[in-house]
């Protein structure tokens, strides 16, 4: 067991303790034989008492403790994560992933696990597995905690990632999803118990590569991080507001030219698949669209029928004009022949001249009927095409309605789902789709012309309300935005900038009115910066800024492992709080900060004490977390390492 220091104790200097050594034979002072610290300059001693062992025996009873192991690690967090991975069954599942590669010194699945451990360690490059100051491949405590016989050279890991195929990727995604699902469900359940909505975010981020590289298959030029660059795009979704703060739900990779709008639907569908739930579909809205479309189709069909009748009339008029023209032409020929036979001179009002005028009028009537007939034919073609499109749309809407009704039929406990997306996603079609999918939508206007139009419609006496440090807003209800068939609530925002004003428009759709306080609306939308923070964390903490390998499957594995790592560290931190037997303030703070855990605690020295009673992780006395202890399993008896010639706490012999 771990003996806490919460019983009565005395505090004194080493000199005072030395006097007790002379007066009392109970305490013992001995050197710590720690082979892993042979280069340490400080002389380290352990202090204890003879009766301490007696007290342990009395507490645990007679038992065989077996072979005790007192090891050290330079990667304390990774030992904890390895224990947690075994607790979740992650390692066992990853070891069953198929990889088409011959086994060398280590199985390919072991290298896949090593790859994940490197990501969890926040290594900058794959070669840091071997070349970092304290290389992971030499840390036996980490290797053991992850259930491996050893870690391979980084070049072997790279070859394994190159050998991985689509079946490897799909199986890894399934394993990570299976392990994550109960924990995601717990996050959702915690929100549901509180009656809170699920707040979801979607964003597109770039994965840059060298602009001159030709060895990244599928990469291309696109807009990334405010500039045109070469690489890939990743559509990320997240859930916020639960006990873990933020969980990343899915990541889908696209080529560099991909744009936000075309990635939205796949991202939302994948997000729903991961969550295992969705909001109540708004089938009544689809039914209303169908009714409106049917009425439009009926009106169009009536117009078509009338136009067909007009076409027939015009055709008859054209035929009549042709017959009249032929008749009048015959009259002209007759009068011409008679005039020539009698030697008449053609006068302006003669019979011949009048006959010629009747021919001209007949020609004009024929030409007019022909023009109207051609215009009618073009109009009929256009309306027939519109009618056909409407029929196709009706069929699609009927199928869409049937799908939504089917999804509603299997939905037992619908939750309110709020989805926040930026302007790049909010095209007319995407807004319509999200509304009918049942989401409460917070977004920005996709087209700047929308904001310009709303500004032109503002009355001169409008009152602006402050919503931010340099932002003011005005509420504009029930706005039709471009081709979206539904009314949206608009918040026209203007920012004070040195050159004047900068305008933008926030949009909202939900079953309830938007937040009554415009500042809450403004802040609620801008809180989507949490997913931007998650993207930044992925690039800066889990090193997605640079691809570790060039193979397409390897890059996709890095993407999926990094997304999982962001969640895994959060879950492990929650788990670790239950294992703490003693923690200073620094460790308590670190357990709430992923960046600190990965960049500091993951590279912090600690002792791993292990015997038949259990395992404990004790942070090094030189670390910021000195003396902090995590009981990984069971109960472990151990002694703290204390520096020589320093003050110390000790238990007097009579204390029990």
Question: For the regions a protein language model found, what residue spans apply to each?
Answer:
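Structured, non-catalytic alpha/beta "coupling" segments that mediate domain-domain communication
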Residues: 69-84
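Anion-binding and metal-coordination hotspots
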Residues: 2-72, 91-656
């Amino acid at each position: 067991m771990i003996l806490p220091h919460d019983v009565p104790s005395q505090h004194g200097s080493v000199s005072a303790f030395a006097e007790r050594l002379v007066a009392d034979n109970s305490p013992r002072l001995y050197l710590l034989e720690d082979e892993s610290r042979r280069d340490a300059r400080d002389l380290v001693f352990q202090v204890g008492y003879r009766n301490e062992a007696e007290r342990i025996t009395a507490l645990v009873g007679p038992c065989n403790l077996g072979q005790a192991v007192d090891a050290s690690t330079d990667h304390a967090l990774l030992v904890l994560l390895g224990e947690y991975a075994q607790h979740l069954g992650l390692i066992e599942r990853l070891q069953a992933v198929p990889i088409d590669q011959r086994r060398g010194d280590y199985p390919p699945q072991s290298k896949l696990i090593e790859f994940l451990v490197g990501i969890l360690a926040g290594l900058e490059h794959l070669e840091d597995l071997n070349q970092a100051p304290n290389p992971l491949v030499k840390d036996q405590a980490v290797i053991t905690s992850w259930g491996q016989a050893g870690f391979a050279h980084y070049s072997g890991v790279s070859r394994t990632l190159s050998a991985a195929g689509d079946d490897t990727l799909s199986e890894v995604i399934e394993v990570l999803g299976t392990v994550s699902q109960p924990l995601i469900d717990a996050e959702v359940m915690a929100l549901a118990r509180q009656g809170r909505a699920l707040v979801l975010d979607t964003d597109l981020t770039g994965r840059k590569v060298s602009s001159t590289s030709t060895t990244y298959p599928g990469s291309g030029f696109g807009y990334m991080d405010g500039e045109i660059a070469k690489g890939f795009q990743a559509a990320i979704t997240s859930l916020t507001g639960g006990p873990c703060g933020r969980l990343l739900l899915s990541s889908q990779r696209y080529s560099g030219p991909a744009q936000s709008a075309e990635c939205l639907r796949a991202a939302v569908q994948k997000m729903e698949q991961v969550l295992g739930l969705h909001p109540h579909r708004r089938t009544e809205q689809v039914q209303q669209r169908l009714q409106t479309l049917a009425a439009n189709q009926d009106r169009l069909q009536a117009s078509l029928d009338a136009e067909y009748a007009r076409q027939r009339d015009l055709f008859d008029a054209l035929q009549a004009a042709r017959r009249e023209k032929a008749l009048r032409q015959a009259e002209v020929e007759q009068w011409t022949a008679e005039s020539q036979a009698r030697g008449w001179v053609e006068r302006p009002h003669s019979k011949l001249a009048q006959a010629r005028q009747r021919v001209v009028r007949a020609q004009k009537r024929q030409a007019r009927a022909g023009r109207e007939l051609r215009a009618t034919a073009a109009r009929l073609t256009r309306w027939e095409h519109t009618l056909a499109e409407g029929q196709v749309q009706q069929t699609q809407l009927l199928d869409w309605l049937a799908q939504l009704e089917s999804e509603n039929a299997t939905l037992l406990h619908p939750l309110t789902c709020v989805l926040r997306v930026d302007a790049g996603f909010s095209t007319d079609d995407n807004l319509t789709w999200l509304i009918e999918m049942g989401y409460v939508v917070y977004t920005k206007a996709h087209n700047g012309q929308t904001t310009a139009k709303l500004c032109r419609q503002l009355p001169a006496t409008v009152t602006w309300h402050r919503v931010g440090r340099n932002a003011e807003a005005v509420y504009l209800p029930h706005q039709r935005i471009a081709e979206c068939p539904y009314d949206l609530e608009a918040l026209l925002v203007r920012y004070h900038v040195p050159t004047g004003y900068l305008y933008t428009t926030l949009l909202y759709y939900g079953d309830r009115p938007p937040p009554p306080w415009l500042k809450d609306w403004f802040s609620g939308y801008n809180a989507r910066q949490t997913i931007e923070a998650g993207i930044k964390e992925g690039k800066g903490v889990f090193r997605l800024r640079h691809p570790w390998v060039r193979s397409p499957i390897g890059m996709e594995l890095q993407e999926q492992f990094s997304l999982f790592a962001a969640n895994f560290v959060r879950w492990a931190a929650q788990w670790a709080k239950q294992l703490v037997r003693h923690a200073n303030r620094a460790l308590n703070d670190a357990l709430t900060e992923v960046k600190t855990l990965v960049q500091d605690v993951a590279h912090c020295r600690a002792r791993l004490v292990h015997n038949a009673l259990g395992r404990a992780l004790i942070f090094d006395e030189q670390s910021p977390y000195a003396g902090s202890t995590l009981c990984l399993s069971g109960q472990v008896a151990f002694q703290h390492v204390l520096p020589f010639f320093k003050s110390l706490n000790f238990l007097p012999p009579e204390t029990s």
